[in-house]
Amino acid sequence: MEDFVRQCFNPMIVELAEKAMKEYGEDLKIETNKFAAICTHLEVCFMYSDFHFINEQGESIVVELDDPNALLKHRFEIIEGRDRTMAWTVVNSICNTTGAEKPKFLPDLYDYKENRFIEIGVTRREVHIYYLEKANKIKSENTHIHIFSFTGEEMATKADYTLDEESRARIKTRLFTIRQEMANRGLWDSFVSPKEAKKQLKKNLKSQELCAGLPTKVSRRTSPALRILEPMWMDSNRTAALRASFLKCPKK
């Protein structure tokens, strides 16, 4: 999976994912599914923002080629991908400037046109189930939720999809391509199935002979990106329990 991620995603996205996992004490060579999940979520966030600007009249426009003479402002502020300190600094700055209510949880984007924070979700499950889970957690009408699936489905707050159909189609196509490429390499099942992921994690630990250097305690912290993506394959409690079950060295 690690090789696939490095081949499939932009190096900048891979680097950001590596930093996120390192910040939370996660080993990408072992937890390769998380590595892939973070990269996927980051790419969707960046694609959401790509080419969208606000012109001098305050209108939202799509510009694919930069015009140095155009006075354009990026429509979206990207919050995801920053370390927690910087991310909250950006959020506080936005709130002070726009008067927006400060969210309880770190969002992924801020939309300067609609003046709202956006939470992006990516899931392999039914989008409405994941949407309800996200809404129940956030419990704020001021944060807009937009969920995408690997099957081309999507769901958003009040059926307001924010982006034009073509922009959303690019995201859906990319997710479908990622799914197909994983399937072609025999990686899809382990990416989305807890049972298969457990087998893969055990295989990774065994093949790398990491037992001697493994920590004795399991980190319970969850990175910001994984708050969105973790349900794609397992929840945090199962992740911690799974990791703990493999941290025991075999008796000599």
UniProtKB/Swiss-Prot annotation:
GO terms for biological process: viral RNA genome replication; viral translational frameshifting. The record marks L28, L65, K202, K203, K206 as: Important for efficient shutoff activity. It is found in: Host cytoplasm; Host nucleus. The keyword Oxidoreductase does not apply. GO terms for molecular function: RNA binding. Keywords: Decay of host mRNAs by virus, Eukaryotic host gene expression shutoff by virus, Host cytoplasm, Host gene expression shutoff by virus, Host mRNA suppression by virus, Host nucleus, Host-virus interaction. The active site is at E80, D108. The probable endonuclease active site in the N-terminus and the basic amino acid cluster in the C-terminus are important for the shutoff activity. The C-terminus acts as a nuclear localization signal. The C-terminus is recruited to host protein complexes involved in nuclear Pol II RNA processing. This is Protein PA-X. It comes from Influenza A virus (strain A/Hong Kong/5/1983 H3N2). The lineage of its organism: Viruses, Riboviria, Orthornavirae, Negarnaviricota, Polyploviricotina.
